[in-house]
């Protein structure tokens, strides 16, 4: 295997270095694109109203499933006067006392009950305290929503939620379980003793601007958002305000980190490539079917992958290879649960994560109840209408993958037609993620997978691996938050590699996998899903070292 790996890497090394290291890195600059779109928008004579889904409409998109709350009451029984017109609002969230993530979840629940329909979520940020520095780090985020509450009534509801969550009067800028601030309210500019909109310190706070930018798309999506840009203290709008503070260059520093909540911890997927080791419990998987069906063999395999550098173990009990037959929920659970329980109890799994690969909501629910940290859905919810609801209620992160059709139809001719595979995959996957968000899965809990080998030809797979930044850029046009989601690539041992290299046996494709994974990481992948953990973990370490070196040189 070593000579084969060396030969493959020598042949691919020159291309990869030329493609990824000589020019500046192919990293998304959504903010720069946003500024161009912003100026184009204002130079237009007619401002079209576009929904968060990018569809022209006469009013803001307001999904009934999320917006059925009684607008006549707040989080308590107090009667609130409402307006007849819905207004789009932006609300910032902060917390540094108690279980910060639970504080956010409860705040969102109370906001919905109080008459605020949340339609978009930012990414999640852990930030250093300012002004009063001798206190715990904050968790910060922001949401967009619509409400019929007037601005002062909205403020009253938010203050009630803060009190209900245990906030008391104390040191200004001091510790608090929950902080809710109105950043924008429709097209209004408000200045009163109790309320100033836009928020008076908005433009100087990176921990507010970072999540605010996430709520936008690099293409201005409606005239209310255009008005918010016009309120900025800089002519380039919100995006230029963010850039003037440092923009994306700030993220990852001690002062502000973009994180994803998994279990009781916050994970930063930007500081290293995370390796996901594959554990197939199926008799018919294309690469290692039937090898790990017993508990002992599965546990032994996990122990080996952990020792070789796996950060995540992805357990699947339903084959998703082309033409795979769908098994019953009970059969999938019978395969999965005993192994999941055994793996969860392994001492080696401390500080490691378990992902369960299923497109069945019943299996997903049981897996999460039995210790799964991540739900990995190859259909992004298209094969089970209950999946998004189950994941939303569970609180676990959701890996949404692009696929057309199902495993039996995904390689049909009609599912292989693309105008531009990266743009089309980004657009279709965004719509699935958007549906998940409107079902209650915040953007800060989403990871994305462009679906290498699923509804793709050889050339499609190569285009995706080489142009991951293009996928992020396309998503950023509609949601900068989604464009920041961790990206997984999973080319491991797949048929297109065999077609390229003349390797009909899946187990002979590990060297080709290393080459494709290397290209993916240098193109911006955060997670690699592989069979051979040892070789790919080494490749990831080398790629990470090259990327760190490049960043250090500016």
Swiss-Prot record:
Transit peptide feature range: 1-42
Assigned EC number: 2.7.6.3, 2.5.1.15
Catalysis: reaction(s): 6-hydroxymethyl-7,8-dihydropterin + ATP = (7,8-dihydropterin-6-yl)methyl diphosphate + AMP + H(+); (7,8-dihydropterin-6-yl)methyl diphosphate + 4-aminobenzoate = 7,8-dihydropteroate + diphosphate
UniProt entry keywords in alphabetical sequence: ATP-binding, Folate biosynthesis, Kinase, Magnesium, Metal-binding, Mitochondrion, Multifunctional enzyme, Nucleotide-binding, Transferase, Transit peptide
Positions of the Pterin-binding domain: 273-541
Induction or repression: Not induced by salt stress.
Keyword Nucleotide-binding attached: yes
Gene Ontology, cellular component aspect: mitochondrion; plasma membrane
Sites where the protein binds (7,8-dihydropterin-6-yl)methyl diphosphate: 320, 357, 376, 449, 494, 529-531
Molecular function per GO: 2-amino-4-hydroxy-6-hydroxymethyldihydropteridine diphosphokinase activity; ATP binding; dihydropteroate synthase activity; kinase activity; metal ion binding
UniProt note on tissues of expression: Ubiquitous.
Pathway note: Cofactor biosynthesis; tetrahydrofolate biosynthesis; 2-amino-4-hydroxy-6-hydroxymethyl-7,8-dihydropteridine diphosphate from 7,8-dihydroneopterin triphosphate: step 4/4; Cofactor biosynthesis; tetrahydrofolate biosynthesis; 7,8-dihydrofolate from 2-amino-4-hydroxy-6-hydroxymethyl-7,8-dihydropteridine diphosphate and 4-aminobenzoate: step 1/2
InterPro entries, per database record: DHP_synth-like, DHP_synth_dom, Dihydropteroate_synth-like_sf, Hppk, Hppk_sf, Pterin-binding_dom
A family per Pfam: HPPK
Start and end residues of each stretch annotated as DHPS: 275-554
Principal subcellular localisation of the protein: mitochondrion
Cofactor(s) for this UniProt protein: Mg(2+)
GO BP term, pick one: folic acid biosynthetic process
Family: In the N-terminal section; belongs to the HPPK family.
Protein name: Folate synthesis bifunctional protein, mitochondrial
Record organism: Arabidopsis thaliana
Taxonomic lineage from the root: Eukaryota, Viridiplantae, Streptophyta, Embryophyta, Tracheophyta
């Amino acid at each position: 295997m070593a000579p084969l790996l060396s030969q493959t890497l020598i042949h691919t090394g020159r291309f990869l270095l030329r493609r990824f290291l000589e020019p500046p890195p192919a990293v998304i600059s959504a903010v720069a694109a946003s500024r161009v779109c912003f100026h184009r928008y204002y130079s237009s004579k007619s401002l079209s109203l576009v929904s968060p889904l990018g569809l022209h409409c006469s009013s803001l998109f307001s999904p009934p499933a999320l917006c059925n709350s009684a607008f006549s009451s707040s989080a308590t029984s107090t009667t609130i006067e409402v307006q007849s017109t819905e207004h789009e609002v932006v609300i910032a969230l902060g917390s540094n006392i108690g279980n910060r993530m639970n504080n956010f979840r409860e705040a969102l629940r109370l906001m919905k009950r109080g008459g605020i329909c949340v339609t978009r979520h930012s990414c999640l940020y852990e930030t250093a305290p300012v002004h009063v520095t001798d206190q715990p780090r904050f968790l910060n985020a922001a949401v967009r929503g619509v409400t019929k509450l007037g601005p002062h009534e909205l403020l009253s509801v938010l203050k009630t939620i803060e009190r209900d969550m245990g906030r008391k009067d104390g040191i200004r800028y001091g510790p608090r379980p929950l902080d809710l601030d109105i950043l924008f309210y429709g097209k209004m500019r408000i200045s009163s003793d109790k309320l100033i909109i836009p928020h008076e310190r908005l433009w100087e706070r990176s921990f507010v601007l970072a999540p605010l930018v996430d709520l936008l798309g690099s293409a201005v999506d409606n005239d209310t958002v255009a008005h918010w840009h016009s309120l900025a203290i800089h002519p380039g709008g919100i995006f230029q305000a963010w850039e003037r503070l440092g923009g994306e260059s700030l993220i990852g520093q001690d002062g502000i980190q973009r994180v994803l909540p998994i279990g009781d911890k916050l994970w930063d997927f930007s500081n290293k490539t995370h390796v996901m080791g594959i554990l197939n419990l199926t008799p018919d998987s294309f690469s290692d079917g039937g090898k790990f069906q017993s508990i002992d063999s599965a546990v032994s395999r996990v122990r080996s992958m952990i020792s070789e550098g796996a950060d995540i173990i992805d357990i699947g009990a339903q084959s998703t290879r082309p033409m795979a037959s769908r098994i019953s929920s009970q059969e999938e659970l019978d395969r999965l649960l005993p192994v999941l329980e055994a793996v969860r109890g392994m001492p080696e799994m401390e500080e490691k994560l378990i992902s369960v690969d299923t497109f069945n909501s019943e299996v997903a629910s049981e897996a999460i109840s039995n210790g799964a940290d991540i739900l990995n859905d190859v259909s992004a919810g298209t094969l089970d209408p209950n999946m998004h609801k189950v994941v939303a209620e569970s609180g676990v992160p959701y890996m949404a993958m692009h696929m057309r059709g199902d495993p039996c139809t995904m390689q049909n001719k009609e599912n292989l037609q693309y105008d531009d595979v990266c743009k089309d995959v980004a657009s279709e996957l965004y719509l699935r993620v958007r549906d998940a968000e409107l079902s209650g899965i915040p953007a800060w809990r989403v990871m994305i997978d462009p679906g290498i080998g699923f509804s793709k030809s050889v050339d499609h797979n190569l285009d995706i691996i080489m142009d991951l930044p293009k996928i992020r850029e396309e998503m950023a046009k509609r949601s900068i938050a989604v464009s920041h989601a961790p990206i997984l690539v999973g080319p491991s041992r797949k048929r297109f590699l065999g077609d390229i290299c003349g390797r009909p046996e899946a187990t002979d494709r590990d060297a080709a996998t290393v080459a494709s994974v290397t290209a993916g990481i240098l193109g911006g992948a955060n997670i690699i899903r592989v069979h051979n953990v040892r070789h790919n973990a080494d490749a990831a370490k080398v790629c990470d070292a090259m990327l760190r070196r490049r960043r250090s040189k500016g």
